């Protein structure tokens, strides 16, 4: 779980510069500001805040799918100086709970095959690999597509 001094809450427009700074610190091919701006209204665009500073974020959306809505974790990052404290897990769990609350049944995400830390977190939360996508990332690295059934996640969490 997240440390007691951290609050996980919905993103606000005023948080976007901090979110972009974290994105740039964490990823070699960061999203631009306007990508985050377009996602402000997603049901699970959440930030982790400590002492007034945003230290991490998660973005997840929901898509109708014939009565079995599908969620998609689009982005999850924790500032390098705040890693190892459970913030990523807290953000992920909060996003999954929000998606479940809006009727999502299954959640998917893509992760770099080489990102062992993220893959371990996702496996701990019940995500299972369903396929590999060759050359998914701009640098040519493959992605693994992972999924979790939220009914199973809820009973196992």
What residues fall within each predicted segment?
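Conserved catalytic-core motifs of GNAT/GCN5-like acyltransferases
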Residues: 108-110, 123, 128-145
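Short coil/turn segments at alpha/beta junctions that flank glycine-rich nucleotide-binding fingerprints
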Residues: 85, 102-105
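Short glycine/proline-centered loop/turn elements that form peptide/ligand docking sites
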Residues: 88, 92, 115-118, 135-140
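Acetyl-CoA-dependent GNAT
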Residues: 3, 10-81, 92-94, 98-102, ...
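Conserved beta-strand edge residues that scaffold enzyme active sites
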Residues: 33, 37, 113, 136-137
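Terminal substrate-recognition subdomain of acyl/acetyltransferases
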Residues: 1-2, 135, 140-157
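Active-site acidic-Proline motif in GNAT/NAT acetyltransferases
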Residues: 79-81, 85, 113-114
């Amino acid at each position: 779980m997240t440390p007691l001094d951290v609050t996980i809450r919905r993103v606000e427009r005023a948080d976007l510069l901090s979110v972009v700074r974290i994105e740039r610190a964490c990823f070699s091919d960061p999203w631009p500001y306007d990508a985050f701006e377009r996602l402000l209204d997603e049901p699970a665009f959440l930030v982790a805040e400590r002492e007034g500073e945003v230290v991490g974020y998660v973005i997840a959306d929901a898509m109708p799918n014939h009565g079995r809505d599908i969620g998609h974790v689009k982005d999850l990052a924790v500032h390098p100086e705040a890693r190892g404290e459970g913030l990523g897990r807290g953000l992920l769990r909060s996003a999954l709970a929000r998606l479940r609350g809006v009727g999502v049944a299954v959640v998917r995400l893509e992760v770099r095959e080489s990102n062992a830390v993220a893959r371990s977190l996702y496996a701990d939360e019940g995500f299972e690999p369903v396929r590999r996508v060759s050359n998914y990332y701009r640098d040519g690295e493959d992605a693994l597509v992972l999924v979790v059934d939220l009914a199973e996640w809820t009973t196992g969490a």
